[in-house]
Swiss-Prot record:
Major localisation: cytoplasm
Gene symbol of the encoding locus: hisB
Keywords: Amino-acid biosynthesis, Cytoplasm, Histidine biosynthesis, Lyase
Protein name: Imidazoleglycerol-phosphate dehydratase
Gene Ontology biological-process annotations: L-histidine biosynthetic process
Amino acid sequence: MLRNMVESRKTSETDIRLDLNLRGSGVYAFDTEIPFFEHMLSHIAKHGLIDMDLKLRGDIGIDCHHSVEDTAILLGQMIHTQLGDKKGIFRYGNFTLPMDEVLTTVAVDLGGRFYFKYTGPALDGKFGIYDAELTLEFLQKLALNAKMNLHVVVHYGENRHHIHESIFKALGKALRQAIAIDTSAKDQIPSTKGMLE
């Protein structure tokens, strides 16, 4: 497993540079011009103990869609690459997180297959220039490019900010569990197939 990676993604719509360390301490720095997105990403970093340094410029004069989507693509690809053959990791992680009146569960499987499912209230409205529906776009593209199963269930809750924050915090916690090294099986691939994509 690689400890640190720096990758870029540049299109006619976005220019992104990400420094990522899955074995970090939760240190982060963001320069995206999308404050709410930075706030959500900080929860993945902090609660996942993932170091992230992200610089993003996108066509936010139109909207934030391309910026959020392309960040998820790059982050997912880097997670998949950095995990390598996945030897020794727990592979699975799940966390149920309370945040005031909200209760959210996130479960992940880093087994090399994509699946995404969200169950909960509609994510709509805006947070500054960030469209709330982009959270689902981010999660789907992250799961697709990290080649992981990602299930998100918001059991109940009302405050839109709390709902979003609980999702990203629980995602960080679940990823932290899944990428952690199982000291009882640190030289084993966590699959009866003997390999993971």
